[in-house]
Amino acid sequence: MWLATPYFLPTWSVRRSLRRAASKGLDVRLLLTGPRTDHPSVRYAGHRYYPRLLRAGVRIFEYQPCFLHLKMAVVDDWVSVGSCNFDHWNLRFNLEANIEALDPPLTAAVVASFERDFAQSEEVDLAHWHARPLWRRVKQRIWGWLDRLVVNFLDRRD
């Protein structure tokens, strides 16, 4: 189960599914945007989910060469490619679309694309995560808190 998205703010159910799959021994990998991003605040807000995912066995890769604006997923022979960022904004509020396919040649092409991108990414592990500088931790806390506040406010409007 490999997932690529530039804005990683998944819903609780998506995070739970990723953790459960990884804890069962499945190869769960996230390909996320690295330091070159158009919305640093969103990147920092999404970092709050890293520790639990890493402890569950999810592998997290941050793409280094440029801004990653890729949105795709592959699970076995199933592929999803499109405009949905797989975050709580797109899954709850925005109108986005993906195309899904069960097509072995397409799956092979998507897997090859993922493998090329993983090779150009920095893998985040728990040791790396715990060694990050204080200023980054502060940014992650602030943006994570603001994101949670906005989502909770918008959820109450329904």
Task: Describe the function of each predicted region.
Residues 2-158:
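PLD/PLD-like phosphodiesterase catalytic module centered on the HKD motif
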